[in-house]
Amino acid sequence: MSTSLAIVRLDPGLPLPSRAHEGDAGVDLYSAEDVRLEPGRRALVRTGVAVAIPFGMVGLVHPRSGLAARVGLSIVNSPGTIDAGYRGEIKVALINLDPAEPIVVHRGDRIAQLLVQRVELVELVEVSSFDEAGLAGTSRGDGGHGSSGGHASL
């Protein structure tokens, strides 16, 4: 089943986002500008497109794995969230994680990928405690941040 996504091309000189391969989950987003990122620096990069995410769905902007592996280019707030009510240009908060080399992003480079997924819009219900609400007693409890074990050498 396919859902349509309305998209506005704000920069007619750029291609629309597209899938690299049939069946890929995400569509590639392109940089609308040239950007030089020094080591450890970040920049908010325009993509030249805006989308109308349908109600009950969310857009998630993920890094491109090849850029992360090859040159250390990633996204600061990964994944970036595009809520259904947002109608502005998609911008990507890129960061250069390479400790020594600058990264140059050129206009038209593929910089991120957009995935659109259904989301459950829950209603928050305040309870005084999980015990009283009958929601306590899991095997994990309040264990977090490393509670399931660490790396073999740590």
Curated annotation (Swiss-Prot):
UniProt GO MF annotations: dUTP diphosphatase activity; magnesium ion binding
CDD domains in UniProt: trimeric_dUTPase
Nucleus keyword on record: no
Superkingdom of this protein's organism: Bacteria
Key words, A-Z: Hydrolase, Magnesium, Metal-binding, Nucleotide metabolism
Record Gene3D superfamilies: 2.70.40.10
Reaction catalysed by this enzyme: dUTP + H2O = dUMP + diphosphate + H(+)
Cofactor(s) for this UniProt protein: Mg(2+)
InterPro entries linked to this entry: dUTPase, dUTPase-like, dUTPase-like_sf, dUTPase_trimeric
Residues that bind substrate: 64-66, 77, 81-83, 91
Leader peptide range in chain numbering: none
Presence of keyword Nucleotidyltransferase: no
Pathway(s) this gene product operates in, as recorded in its UniProt entry: Pyrimidine metabolism; dUMP biosynthesis; dUMP from dCTP (dUTP route): step 2/2
EC number: 3.6.1.23
BP terms from Gene Ontology: dUMP biosynthetic process; dUTP catabolic process
Note: Each trimer binds three substrate molecules. The ligands are bound between subunits, and for each substrate molecule, residues from adjacent subunits contribute to the binding interactions.
Known function: This enzyme is involved in nucleotide metabolism: it produces dUMP, the immediate precursor of thymidine nucleotides and it decreases the intracellular concentration of dUTP so that uracil cannot be incorporated into DNA.
Family: Belongs to the dUTPase family.
Assembly and oligomerization: Homotrimer.
Protein name as annotated: Deoxyuridine 5'-triphosphate nucleotidohydrolase
Organism of origin: Mycolicibacterium paratuberculosis (strain ATCC BAA-968 / K-10) (Mycobacterium paratuberculosis)
Lineage: Bacteria, Bacillati, Actinomycetota, Actinomycetes, Mycobacteriales
